[in-house]
Every structure is written in C-alpha cells, then in structure tokens.
UniProtKB/Swiss-Prot annotation:
Name used for this protein in its record: Argininosuccinate synthase
Cell location: Cytoplasm
UniProt-listed Pfam families: Arginosuc_syn_C, Arginosuc_synth
Keywords: Amino-acid biosynthesis, Arginine biosynthesis, ATP-binding, Cytoplasm, Ligase, Nucleotide-binding
GO-annotated molecular function: argininosuccinate synthase activity; ATP binding
Major location category of this protein: cytoplasm
Entry keyword Cytoplasm: yes
HAMAP family per record: Arg_succ_synth_type1
Pathway(s): Amino-acid biosynthesis; L-arginine biosynthesis; L-arginine from L-ornithine and carbamoyl phosphate: step 2/3
Organism: Micrococcus luteus (strain ATCC 4698 / DSM 20030 / JCM 1464 / CCM 169 / CCUG 5858 / IAM 1056 / NBRC 3333 / NCIMB 9278 / NCTC 2665 / VKM Ac-2230) (Micrococcus lysodeikticus)
Length: 413
C-alpha cells in the first residue's frame, strides 16, 4: 500500500495544485481534509468534490463551526485575548482545531505525514506543526510552498497545464484568512506601511465614517460565556454570527497593526473582527463588575501570557492548560448583562447589571443611605501609608545629616 499524506485543504488554487504536486514529488497518495470554521464561501460538498477531481484519493470534510466557537473562541473571550493589545487571535485560534481534525484524519486513513499550505516566513507553519506534533508525535509534517518549491506562479501554470477545476488568477493581491471570529488581510500594497487600506480590503465591516443609526444590544453572560442577545437564548456560534452582522454594519472591529511575528519579523496586518471585539468589550466590563480587585489585577497578567502562548502556537501546551484552569476559576461569578451601543466603529458600554457582582450601591453612593463607615478611613490611611512614611523619615534623616556635614565643611573653608 502506498504511503498516504494528509493535506489541509481549503479548496483554493494553492492547495488544489498541492494535491498533484505532493503526489508527484513524493509518490504518495493524498487525502484532502477541509475544515469549516465559519469562513463562508463554498459548501463543504463542493470543496470535497473539487479535491477528488484534483486527484485526492479521499476527501475528509468537517463542519467544525460549533466546535470552534465553543471550544476555541469562548476560551479566547474568557482571556480577553488581544495580542499586542489589538489582535484577537483570529487565525491563531483556528489552527489548533484544524490540526485536531488533520490528526484525526491521519489516524482514520493510515497516513504518516501531514501537509499544510503555509510559507516558511509566517506564524501559521509553527502553529500547525507544533499542534500536529503535540497531538500526533509520530506524524511528520511537510509544507509544499516551503519544502517543495511550490510558488504562486508555478501553481497557476500547473493548474492550467493539468486542466484542474479551479480558477487561476493573479488579480487579488491580498492574502486572506477568515473564520467566524474574524478576518485577516495581508500582503499586496499593504506591505508598504505608509499606505492606508483601501475600501476593497474590508468585507466583514462597513465604513464607520458613514454608520446607520446606533444599534443597542444587550449581551447576557453565564460564567464568562455569552448566552443570549436582547433576551434571546443563542449558541456561542449564533451570538458571534449575529454580532458580526450588527457590529460589522457599524464598522466595529477594524484593526490595522504592525505585528511582531513569532518568526522574528514585523508584519503589517489588517483585521476585521466585529463580533469578537464587541464581545471582548462586554466581557471585560462584566469582569470589572464581578471580579475582586487583586484577582482582576493578576488575571490581566495571566491573560497576556495566555494570549502570547496561543499566538505562538502553544494551544496544547501544559502551561496553556494550567492557565485555562485559573481563568475558568475566575469566571465563576462572571454572570450578568452588558448593554452596548454599536455605532461609528465603536462598541461602547452603556449599562451593566449582575446579581453576582461586587458593586454595592449603598457602599458607593454619596447620597442618603450611604453605608460606608467613613470613620474607618483615618486608621486605614495611617496603616496603608506606614511603610512609605517610614522610608521617607529615613531619607530625610540621612539627608539632614548630610546637610549638616556640608555646613561644617563650608565653615572650615
């Protein structure tokens, strides 16, 4: 029996050509694997048939939209994950779920190697291969673009020569990756970081300079996970999809960043993540209401490290799992509702309520009914400032001694 190679298949030009390219270069049979994480476009059946028409001996397709939303997007939301305080890990969190299906397909079809379409200078090669090696330590990984010299020009020529059922064009200058959590755009004229993005860069969001009337939405959370919009119970996938539509119509979630890649270079990236950014804004505010101060302060450090690990392809690492445990524990009381106004590119908190919150009106109010015992403040201040006061007294004592020595020296002169 011939060796089999699992190929992460998107249905596009590069991976369609990679089926025959890999087979010719290695002599192996290729099994195409397509995973739907909410990227839209063609149906899985259309993609499956194209893979077979391009020479795959088998085609494995998986609708992973709910899995992706519940098991990957929701942990990302709980961690308020924004790499470099901006990027909500759009591509970074899709690679682990795709990798899980690639490894499952390798077991099902008896393959010993997994192939992906990443270049040798991006983050995704690391994310795929680290995830695959973690889930299947016995599996090998190859990348046709990186390892088998498959360039875009060669792919077009190969597709035309072999009459593959795929459109070949050089018209679109951008490299685009998208899923239900967001959309990533790079290359083309965007590589000159002085150039501003043009209207054709965007697809998930409308121009925030010309918004419709404000859209007010109430998001309900249970243990840090959104459960309803405007009183309607919905799944995580449905909530993300609806907020993509509503926040996207208001231009929310546009991000333009020069990003520090894992491989050591800086890269200009454009992201659209209307649903993700609206949810993160709401979740952060609900944490402000429900988390104890020291817990919230420490969680920010954990969130940042969690985000860095996931960006760097360490979704399945021991440390990331340990941080998951801490983050999940902090979400026990993150229950309630946040009211957001979506308008002009912004998701602005207008109201918040929680039965498990730590906001106590009677303690916070300055009006009648104030239950805060202000007489306790003086003793608290004395104790709270004692160490700083003691240090200051030492400095003044030493400075005074030095000043006396200076006066004596001047007198002798």
């Amino acid at each position: 029996m011939k060796e089999r190679i699992i190929l992460a298949y998107s249905g596009g030009l590069d991976t369609s050509v990679a089926i025959g390219w890999i087979a010719e270069a290695t002599g192996a049979e290729v099994v195409a694997v397509a995973v739907d994480v909410g990227q839209g476009g063609e149906s899985l059946e259309t993609i499956r048939q194209r893979a077979l028409d391009c020479g795959a001996v088998e085609a494995y397709v998986a609708d992973a939209r709910d899995e992706f939303a519940e098991q990957y997007c929701m942990p990302t939301l709980k961690a308020n994950a924004l790499y470099m305080d901006a990027y909500p890990l759009v591509s970074a969190i899709s690679r682990p779920v795709i990798s899980r299906h690639l490894v499952a397909a390798a077991r099902q079809f008896g393959a010993s190697t997994v192939a992906h379409g990443c270049t040798g200078k991006g983050n995704d090669q690391v994310r795929f291969e680290v995830s695959i090696q973690t889930l299947g330590p016995d599996l090998k990984c190859i990348a046709p673009v990186r390892d088998l010299a498959l360039t875009r020009e060669k792919a077009i020529e190969y597709a035309e020569r072999n009459d593959l059922p795929i459109v070949t064009t050089k018209k679109n200058p951008f490299s685009i990756d998208q899923n239900v959590w967001g959309r990533a755009v790079e290359t083309g004229f965007l590589e000159d970081i002085w150039n501003g993005p043009t209207k054709d860069v965007y697809d998930y969001t409308d121009d925030p300079a010309f918004p419709p009337a404000p859209d007010v939405v109430t998001i309900a959370f249970e243990r840090g996970v959104p459960t309803a919009l405007d009183g309607r119970a919905l799944s995580p996938l449905e909530i993300i999809e609806e907020l993509n539509r509503r926040a996207g119509a208001q231009g929310v979630g546009r991000i333009d960043i020069v990003e520090d890649r894992l491989v050591g270079i800086k890269s200009r990236e454009i992201y659209e993540a209307p649903g993700a950014m609206a949810l993160i804004a709401a979740h952060r505010e609900l944490e402000n209401v429900t988390l104890e101060r020291e817990q919230a302060r420490f969680k920010k450090h954990v969130d940042q490290r969690w985000t860095e690990l996931v960006y760097d392809g360490q979704w399945y690492s021991p440390l990331k799992r340990n941080l998951d445990t801490f983050i999940d524990a902090t979400q026990e009381h993150v229950n309630g509702e946040i009211r957001l106004e979506l308008h002009g590119g912004r998701a602005t908190v207008q109201g918040r309520r929680s039965e498990t919150g730590l906001y106590d009106f009677n303690l916070a109010t300055y009006d009648e009914g104030d239950s805060f015992d202000q007489s306790s403040a003086r003793g608290f201040i004395d104790i709270f400032g004692l160490s700083a006061k003691t240090a200051s007294e030492r400095e003044q004592r030493l400075r005074g001694s030095a000043d006396l020595q200076d006066v004596a020296r001047l007198s002798n002169d």
